[in-house]
Amino acid sequence: MESMLNKLKSTVTKVTADVTSAVMGNPVTREFDVGRHIASGGNGLAWKIFNGTKKSTKQEVAVFVFDKKLIDKYQKFEKDQIIDSLKRGVQQLTRLRHPRLLTVQHPLEESRDCLAFCTEPVFASLANVLGNWENLPSPISPDIKDYKLYDVETKYGLLQVSEGLSFLHSSVKMVHGNITPENIILNKSGAWKIMGFDFCVSSTNPSEQEPKFPCKEWDPNLPSLCLPNPEYLAPEYILSVSCETASDMYSLGTVMYAVFNKGKPIFEVNKQDIYKSFSRQLDQLSRLGSSSLTNIPEEVREHVKLLLNVTPTVRPDADQMTKIPFFDDVGAVTLQYFDTLFQRDNLQKSQFFKGLPKVLPKLPKRVIVQRILPCLTSEFVNPDMVPFVLPNVLLIAEECTKEEYVKLILPELGPVFKQQEPIQILLIFLQKMDLLLTKTPPDEIKNSVLPMVYRALEAPSIQIQELCLNIIPTFANLIDYPSMKNALIPRIKNACLQTSSLAVRVNSLVCLGKILEYLDKWFVLDDILPFLQQIPSKEPAVLMGILGIYKCTFTHKKLGITKEQLAGKVLPHLIPLSIENNLNLNQFNSFISVIKEMLNRLESEHKTKLEQLHIMQEQQKSLDIGNQMNVSEEMKVTNIGNQQIDKVFNNIGADLLTGSESENKEDGLQNKHKRASLTLEEKQKLAKEQEQAQKLKSQQPLKPQVHTPVATVKQTKDLTDTLMDNMSSLTSLSVSTPKSSASSTFTSVPSMGIGMMFSTPTDNTKRNLTNGLNANMGFQTSGFNMPVNTNQNFYSSPSTVGVTKMTLGTPPTLPNFNALSVPPAGAKQTQQRPTDMSALNNLFGPQKPKVSMNQLSQQKPNQWLNQFVPPQGSPTMGSSVMGTQMNVIGQSAFGMQGNPFFNPQNFAQPPTTMTNSSSASNDLKDLFG
């Protein structure tokens, strides 16, 4: 990379040095800026050709420079001869003006170091193009190195040279004397021009007589720059020292041979022995056959052979050569016509331009761009010719790249965009609008192209408006959206509303309908559809245009019309239009069809919406009912909780609610609340309830204060009382339970020895009861069974203080007393013998009359005892209807057998005091004194 940069730097430095050294100080530099070295030309390619511009007009030129350093090796007189020869050729060229001759724009200027003059812009010499790169900058420019001549360029170039020679021979009476590839210059447009008049010979006879051209003898001692190129020189010039116009035609033949033979001449001449070489050449020419001209096209081969004939009079003259069939190629004729265009009138030009589109595809792009395009754009100054020239220019633009279009064509189109007359100009532009919008830069589109379209819409000519409206949809997709929305659409609407032409109004509606797809939905709904209601006319074509826009918007997948718009604006507008009297049957059917489609969609969309709303309302109702149920359940649960709390405090000693049950209920409440959608007030209420429940759980269990009884004076233990109590208990165990009274609301309680178990706090055992039980009544560790009705109040006596209105819970909470008291099935009842109490007789004191224990035990039970003893054969707990048993073995319980008020059976209180038993009284007196 670095070596490449160094090489480039050295090249630029060298070129700059060459220019500086060659041109510096030359008067040409006062008026022209000299650019880079591009080519070489002239005799021996001695002239270096540079790009240049004129300082005053910035016009592009070519600067020819001869550096005197090239002839430093010569002696002074030889230098002078060379300089004089070069000056003579440039001066002669400057005096001659012809399209086929190189145009000199600034005459020759001489300085101490160089000779210089300026011409029209130049590409290269024909010798450079054919591969002779002498005196060219290094490296060779790719433009020259890769340059290949097209057939049409070759044909027309040779035709141009022939025309130039015809001008010299016929008009100027001059022989050029050195027609070579070095002296044929290709200008910037590709035209072939003649230069190098260093050895030209003018006729010595008056113009009306036969021209006579003096000829100088060949002097091999002269410098090569003072002699013509012998390889292209006619034989008679050397051998017979004569020259005439035919000598130039021989040179033309050798040039044609070189062009078709890659730049090589037909003969190579030994300059040291020129005469011998030409003699040998003369023999070869006399025997020249077609085999030697195989590289030359067949249609021109015979003419080249004639040009190379040894006899000058046989050679065709220049005028004859311009008319040979070889040059009748359509491309060459077209290029020739362009070169003579300035001589034609408008009618001839118009006819030529009309046929040009058929020829352009046959020509190479380089030829079109270099040769034809400049001629076409030069006609833009003639408004009458613009409609004929513009289609060809736009056709060329299609084949150009975007860069070429911007550089070569767009600057020329700028003034044409602003022309409104003739109207064909706008039509042509509108037809090619897609091309313009594709290749024109965005800034130029906004500044030049779209304003032309706007002017066409606002033009007073109805024809222009119609054409514009018809063409706009074809390129609407290329217009940027802001320009379309803010500039184009408003002008189309104005054209529709303000015109008096039905065609313009209809075309406006059709145009809008075609460009709807490039607009957004809300712009159409808010701007286009309301505009339709402003159209005043009711002609069928207008009404169908309105219907078309509605239908297009309604059915387009990108646009669409909302049901609100349909119901509120579209249908109220369309329905009255549908019954206009001007509409025929088909048009009416079209209206009705669109209206029905709109109604169907309106119905389906709104019905769907209402169905969805209905479903949502039903869901909301179900949620509201659920919330109400949740609230009622919450209130019920709260009431139950309150009742349970009341029972906790009112039923001390009863079956209390366990903590696990309350927790389960709280969890159930929480789950219900979670499942329901709660309002903020309900959530606040739930939070408060949770706080209260948490407080209740966190409180310590109620512990009644233990009152220690006042110590009483110790009394002597009465063993007799204790014994009697024990005996009564033992006796009750052997007695069967009597049958329960049907009228009693209490379940029968077993005999006196059966204990009923309650899981009560310990303070219940300390509580003084008024039902006849002692507060210090002992607990039993063994459980007994008893039938239980789970819905029965055990303690309904108003005298009961410690326990009130207790209702047992569900049956599974009842203990099972069955296992201890019910004998196995099938067991025989054994006859119980009286208990022998004689062993206890010694417990009585001697001071009292003795009554044996057996006598006491055999006394009949009184009426009180019958209340607590079940009759024989009465159902036991095993036959209880509930079938629910509570096993409380191992639990502490207090005995209720001593209190007959717990469960009286078959007992009726007499109205009077029970009669005292005399025997019993006597026995007690005997027992206790």
UniProtKB/Swiss-Prot annotation:
HEAT repeats lie at residues 443-479. It comes from the Eukaryota. PROSITE patterns: PROTEIN_KINASE_DOM (PS50011). Residues 661-701 form a coiled coil. Could autophosphorylate in presence of poly-L-lysine. Residues 684-694 have a biased composition (Basic and acidic residues). Residues 684-709, 906-929 are annotated as: Disordered. It is found in: Cytoplasmic vesicle, Clathrin-coated vesicle; Golgi apparatus, trans-Golgi network membrane; Endosome membrane. GO terms for molecular function: ATP binding; protein kinase activity; signaling receptor binding. The keyword Coiled coil applies. Residues 695-705 have a biased composition (Low complexity). Gene3D superfamilies: Leucine-rich Repeat Variant, Phosphorylase Kinase, domain 1, Transferase(Phosphotransferase) domain 1. One of its GO terms (biological process) is pyramidal neuron development. The keyword Cell inner membrane does not apply. Belongs to the protein kinase superfamily. This is SCY1-like protein 2. It comes from Homo sapiens (Human). The lineage of its organism: Eukaryota, Metazoa, Chordata, Craniata, Vertebrata.
